[in-house]
């Protein structure tokens, strides 16, 4: 019973719940960006590059033989995934910049009175 109680306390901490929400939102955001790249950007890029479909760009290492499919290096899909990553990384970078601007800077803690007095005493002793 103690184990369940400890787990519940751990799971309900603010950091864990915030992280879980962030992972879910990040996953959904990733799907949106992937769709944006594959359904909007890549077709336009394909038209600009002469009608090339990046999904079909590949090197054939071994031809298909009977029921065995061809062995390929799908570099077109890799290019598409790199573009996905760049867009996601840029969007996260921009969100962090906005969050850091909005976040209030930490207030400087006042110097404890004892430390101030000791500093003054030290300075007075130096001047003697």
Curated annotation (Swiss-Prot):
Keywords, A to Z, come to: Cell inner membrane, Cell membrane, Ion channel, Ion transport, Membrane, Transmembrane, Transmembrane helix, Transport
Q: What membrane topology does the annotation report for this chain?
A: Multi-pass membrane protein
Secretion signal span: none
Location of this chain's protein in the cell: Cell inner membrane
In terms of Gene3D superfamilies, this protein maps to: Large-conductance mechanosensitive channel, MscL, domain 1 (1.10.1200.120)
One MF term from GO for this chain? Answer: mechanosensitive monoatomic ion channel activity
Keyword hit for Iron-sulfur = no
Where are the membrane-spanning stretches? 10-30, 76-96
- Give any Pfam family that matches: MscL
What cellular-component terms does GO give this entry? plasma membrane
- Subunit-level organization: Homopentamer.
Q: Which family does it belong to?
A: Belongs to the MscL family.
What is the documented function of this protein? Channel that opens in response to stretch forces in the membrane lipid bilayer. May participate in the regulation of osmotic pressure changes within the cell.
NCBIfam families referenced in this protein's UniProt entry, alphabetically: mscL, PRK00567.1-4
Q: Which HAMAP family match?
A: MscL
Protein name as it appears in the record: Large-conductance mechanosensitive channel
List the source organism.
Haemophilus influenzae (strain PittEE)
Q: Please name the gene that encodes this protein.
A: mscL
């Amino acid at each position: 019973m103690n184990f369940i109680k400890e787990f519940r306390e751990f799971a309900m901490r603010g950091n864990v719940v915030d992280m879980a929400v962030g992972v879910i939102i990040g996953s959904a955001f990733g799907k949106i960006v992937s769709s944006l790249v594959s359904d909007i950007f890549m077709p336009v890029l394909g038209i600009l590059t002469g009608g090339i479909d990046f999904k079909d760009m590949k090197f054939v290492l071994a031809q298909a033989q009977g029921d065995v499919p061809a062995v390929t290096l799908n570099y077109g899909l890799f290019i598409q995934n790199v573009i996905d990553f760049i867009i996601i990384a840029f969007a996260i970078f921009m969100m962090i910049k906005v969050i850091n601007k909005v976040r209030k800077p930490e207030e400087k803690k006042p110097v404890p009175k004892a430390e101030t007095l000791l500093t003054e005493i030290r300075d007075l002793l130096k001047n003697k």
